[in-house]
């Protein structure tokens, strides 16, 4: 019974997941690494941010624990400027 109640609570309350990735603009272009990368990630709900090399994009801002509503780099989509 406890498992069923716990499952029901999770479904009712909802659980927002988090993920790591290169934060992007709506057009799937990365934010290039700037001194404020950590602040950018935190402002968008992440726990931290750092500079990392991304092939094809250069030095980009990598965020940890971003919420699902913040876009991250989709490798199957191109950056459209």
UniProtKB/Swiss-Prot annotation:
Chief location: secreted
Subcellular location: Secreted
GO terms assigned for molecular function: sodium channel inhibitor activity; toxin activity
SMART domains (alphabetical): Knot1
BP GO terms, sorted: defense response
Disulfide bonds: 29-79, 33-51, 37-61, 41-63
Swiss-Prot/TrEMBL keywords: Disulfide bond, Ion channel impairing toxin, Neurotoxin, Secreted, Signal, Toxin, Voltage-gated sodium channel impairing toxin
One cellular component term from this protein's GO annotations in UniProt: extracellular region
Keyword Glycoprotein on entry: no
CDD domains: neurotoxins_LC_scorpion
PROSITE patterns: LCN_CSAB
Pfam families associated with the record: Toxin_3
Sequence ranges assigned to domain LCN-type CS-alpha/beta in this UniProt record: 19-80
Purpose: Alpha toxins bind voltage-independently at site-3 of sodium channels (Nav) and inhibit the inactivation of the activated channels, thereby blocking neuronal transmission.
Family stated for the protein in its record: Belongs to the long (4 C-C) scorpion toxin superfamily. Sodium channel inhibitor family. Alpha subfamily.
Entry note about domains: Has the structural arrangement of an alpha-helix connected to antiparallel beta-sheets by disulfide bonds (CS-alpha/beta).
Name of the protein described by the UniProt record: Alpha-toxin Ac1
Species of origin: Androctonus crassicauda
Lineage start: Eukaryota, Metazoa, Ecdysozoa, Arthropoda, Chelicerata
